[in-house]
Amino acid sequence: MLEKNLDKAIEKVLVSEEEIIEKSKELGEILTKEYEGKNPLVLGILRGSVPFLAELIKHIDCHLETDFMTVSSYHGGTKSSGEVKLILDVDTAVKGRDILIVEDIIDTGRTLKYLKELLEHRGANVKIVTLLDKPEGRIVEIKPDYSGFTIPNEFVVGFGLDYEENYRNLPYVGVLKPEVYNK
């Protein structure tokens, strides 16, 4: 049974809604300069990146296109399965394009490393922007080109991040209480 008030499942707020909006504005200004005159393909990684992508592109003041991919290394639970699966490929031709991958979080790095290598192999110039970077969780070597917040190695939900498909709609990023997932 789901709780009626999602906030009750949160141990603490790591990044507030106001901080996310402010950081999205800052990143948008940087990305506007980076991609001025280039018409980048802003590639959201479904499903978690949707809130961040929606907030971020409002602050990028240049022509851009958007598309989406679904790649997963989580199959429920709180730990990565280690296996990266391409579930939905990009519809747009990527050869010769500037691509900005938008991700909600970089944890183990497996998903982003896989995606970056796949798109570069297809002839794209790829950069990565992530709302959250969790370097303590890294298993493979990959660094985002642009990052909103560096966070500790805790299981977080909200602003697109989920636990068993719940909590994505929280307007902030918070640490989920262990009793929620240690049942």
Curated annotation (Swiss-Prot):
Keywords: Cytoplasm, Glycosyltransferase, Magnesium, Metal-binding, Nucleotide-binding, Purine salvage, Transferase. SUPFAM superfamilies: PRTase-like (SSF53271). One of its GO terms (biological process) is guanine salvage. It holds the Pfam family Pribosyltran. Its cofactor is Mg(2+). GO terms for molecular function: guanine phosphoribosyltransferase activity; hypoxanthine phosphoribosyltransferase activity; magnesium ion binding; nucleotide binding. It is found in: Cytoplasm. InterPro entries: HGPRT, Hxn_phspho_trans, PRibTrfase_dom, PRTase-like. It catalyses: IMP + diphosphate = hypoxanthine + 5-phospho-alpha-D-ribose 1-diphosphate; GMP + diphosphate = guanine + 5-phospho-alpha-D-ribose 1-diphosphate. This is Hypoxanthine-guanine phosphoribosyltransferase. It comes from Lactococcus lactis subsp. lactis (strain IL1403) (Streptococcus lactis). The gene is hpt.
